[in-house]
Design a protein with these regions (language model features):
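Flexible, solvent-exposed loop/hinge segments and secondary-structure transition points
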Residues: 1-142
Length: 142
């Protein structure tokens, strides 16, 4: 679902030993020029804490605007969840969705939007299991 070759490492962010967010690696193969790797921070209420693209081969000046160093577009996901907007709005505006695409580049932002939605779905489906497994591992280290 998340496009990872291996299980990928999900990390839990804690505040005063209480879990507050998960940091989830996610890769979409649907970029214009290939895979787009990102990390998605998900608050335990299911909202996006933050997203960063960590690797891509998108066209300079067009699709590379998914990278925070090129554009602040990626910050538009902060605070969003599968309830805000509704799941059918997790698309680019060109396809009646909530999120902007770039002039001359729709494929790249569409791929990122869809992958973030998949990551939120994964988190919501596996939240309790992730929390239990990671809390158990954390307790063994303490």
């Amino acid at each position: 679902m998340l496009g990872l070759n291996s299980g990928g490492d999900v990390h839990i962010a804690r505040l005063d030993a209480l879990p507050v967010a998960a940091i989830i690696p996610s890769v979409t193969p649907e970029g214009y020029s290939g895979d787009i790797a990102m990390i998605v921070g998900v608050n335990f209420d299911g909202s996006v804490a933050g997203v960063r693209v960590v690797e891509h081969k998108e066209t300079p000046g067009l699709g590379d605007k998914v990278d925070l160093r090129k554009s602040d577009w990626i910050l538009g996901f902060n605070g969003k969840s599968l309830k805000n907007p509704e799941p059918n709005a997790w698309n680019v505006k060109k396809e009646q969705g909530e999120f902007d695409q770039f002039t001359g580049a729709t494929i790249t932002p569409r791929a990122v939007v869809h992958q973030i939605a998949k990551t939120l779905e994964y988190f919501n489906q596996d939240k309790q299991r992730l929390l239990n497994e990671l809390s158990s591992a954390y307790n063994q280290l303490s």
